[in-house]
């Protein structure tokens, strides 16, 4: 059966950014708006391994998790019709970063450290990197270290104080501008 081709600015979009910026929620809605499939990389890894992300960190360590992420990215960049929501640290890997930047538009989502903390605390057990005495300071430190890499994304959108629909609308507009600039 032939796939119905509809006008869309991209057939593979990656969402990156720090934990708690809204990549998963926004990714689902963006995929719906663009009529693409949605994959949350963390959930994908959990399904493949049968182990939750916190348990992977706890029992196998961060290094093992990063290897799993890299392998999953390598596999998924070969897919089409996909919005891929990365884990907060996935884009830090140079190999994954290069593959994703070359595959299609990468959208970096941003939020303030305070917003990130508030959102992350809604699911405290799911955020292994924040199991520290001062999580806000940890967020600031990690965000400062990761920001130069997130800035390599093609498109940047703030999620602070905004509804998901608003953010998705802005991303779609910027994806069309990005496609036009590239002559697609």
Swiss-Prot record:
Binds 1 Mg(2+) ion per subunit. Its EC number is 2.7.1.71. Keywords: Amino-acid biosynthesis, Aromatic amino acid biosynthesis, ATP-binding, Cytoplasm, Kinase, Magnesium, Metal-binding, Nucleotide-binding, Transferase. Pathway: Metabolic intermediate biosynthesis; chorismate biosynthesis; chorismate from D-erythrose 4-phosphate and phosphoenolpyruvate: step 5/7. GO terms for cellular component: cytosol. It is found in: Cytoplasm. InterPro entries: P-loop_NTPase, Shikimate/glucono_kinase, Shikimate_kinase/TSH1, Shikimate_kinase_CS. Substrate binds at residues 42, 66, 88, 146. ATP binds at residues 20-25, 127, 162. It catalyses: shikimate + ATP = 3-phosphoshikimate + ADP + H(+). Its main location: cytoplasm. GO terms for molecular function: ATP binding; magnesium ion binding; shikimate kinase activity. Its cofactor is Mg(2+). Mg(2+) binds at residue 24. One of its GO terms (biological process) is aromatic amino acid family biosynthetic process. Monomer. Belongs to the shikimate kinase family. Catalyzes the specific phosphorylation of the 3-hydroxyl group of shikimic acid using ATP as a cosubstrate. This is Shikimate kinase.
């Amino acid at each position: 059966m032939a796939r119905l081709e509809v006008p869309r600015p991209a057939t593979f979009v990656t969402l990156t950014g720090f934990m708690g910026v809204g990549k998963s929620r926004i990714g689902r809605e963006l995929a719906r708006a663009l009529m693409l499939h949605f994959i949350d990389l963390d959930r994908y890894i959990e399904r493949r391994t049968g182990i939750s992300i916190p348990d992977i960190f706890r029992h196998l360590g961060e290094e093992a998790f990063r290897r799993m992420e890299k392998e999953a990215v390598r596999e998924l960049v070969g897919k089409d019709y996909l919005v891929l929501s990365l884990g907060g640290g996935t884009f830090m890997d140079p190999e994954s970063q290069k593959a994703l930047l070359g595959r299609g538009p990468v959208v970096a989502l941003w939020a303030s450290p305070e917003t990130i903390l508030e959102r992350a605390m809604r699911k405290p057990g799911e955020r292994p990197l924040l199991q520290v005495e001062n999580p806000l300071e940890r967020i600031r430190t990690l965000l400062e270290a990761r920001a130069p890499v997130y800035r390599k994304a093609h498109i940047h959108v703030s999620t602070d104080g905004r509804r998901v629909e608003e953010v998705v609308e802005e991303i779609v507009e910027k994806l069309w501008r990005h496609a036009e600039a590239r002559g697609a």
